[in-house]
């Protein structure tokens, strides 16, 4: 099992992740990408995972350049068309624990390699109070920013399913952005409607592409819903 926090330079890994995911044989490896959307533990520097117009230490918001220029890197979807014979790919959000646990169980049971991208709040880098972490995480999916979906590759053919978060709710999206200090320059001293609309537009473009992929490569039952009785889970043994 590999833990990956930064994915803008996958070639920095000692064993290349893309090489493992491309292997045809049985390969029981799970990569978990905890996506905090920047190089957080080294100083909140911008990365490929940073969303548009977010302020970081290497791309601070100013009068001329309002934060990051460019879109957030899509990590999960391209792997579905990587040519691998068997893969399990998914996005998760801890604000939806049943979905997260169900996907992690499926990933660990997969005969092939698995890659799970987790929405990972960082109160220091995102500039918000600690007690708002779960609220913000839930808003991320509810507003359409962080959709929850799965790609199961069998014999090289991807099959898409989703749980929620593909439809944009503009009011919730604005609330989501406003809840974090990394976007405060979009609201103060003036309301930067053009930049906010661009973030929503880029996100909607991505979600529309996902909808088309689900339509073209979707399962017979495209909605993925996990029912987990957490009371029946065995207690963890810590040694």
Labelled PLM ranges:
Residues 27, 85, 142-146:
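Structural alpha-beta junctions
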Residues 27-32, 37, 77, 86-90, ...:
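Structural motif
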Residues 1-46, 95-102, 107:
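Thiamine diphosphate
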Residues 120-239:
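Flexible, low-complexity linker and terminal segments
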Residues 93-130, 134-136:
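ATP/pyrophosphate-binding catalytic subdomain of soluble kinases
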Residues 48-110:
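Conserved thiamine diphosphate
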Residues 15-19, 46-51, 130-135:
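Short secondary-structure boundary/capping segments
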């Amino acid at each position: 099992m590999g833990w990956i926090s930064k994915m803008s330079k996958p070639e920095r890994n000692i064993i290349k992740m893309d090489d493992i995911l491309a292997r045809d044989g049985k390969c029981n490896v799970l990569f978990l990408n905890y996506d905090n959307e920047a190089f957080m533990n080294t100083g909140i520097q911008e990365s490929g995972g940073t969303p548009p117009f977010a302020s970081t230490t290497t791309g601070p918001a100013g009068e001329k350049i309002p934060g990051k220029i460019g879109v957030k890197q899509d990590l999960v979807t391209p792997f579905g068309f990587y040519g691998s014979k068997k893969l399990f790919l998914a996005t998760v959000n801890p604000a939806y624990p049943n979905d997260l646990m169900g996907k992690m169980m499926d990933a660990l049971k997969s005969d092939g390699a698995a890659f799970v991208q987790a929405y990972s709040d960082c109160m220091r880098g995102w500039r918000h109070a600690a007690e708002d972490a779960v609220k913000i995480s839930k808003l991320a999916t509810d507003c359409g920013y962080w959709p929850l979906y799965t790609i199961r590759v069998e014999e090289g053919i991807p099959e898409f399913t989703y749980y929620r978060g593909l439809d944009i709710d503009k009011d919730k999206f604005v609330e989501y952005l406003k809840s974090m200090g990394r976007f405060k320059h979009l609201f103060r001293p003036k309301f930067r409607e053009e930049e906010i609309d661009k973030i929503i537009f880029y996100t909607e473009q991505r979600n529309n592409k996902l909808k088309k992929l689900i339509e073209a490569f979707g399962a017979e039952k495209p909605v993925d819903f996990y029912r987990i009785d957490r009371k029946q889970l065995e207690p963890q043994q810590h040694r």
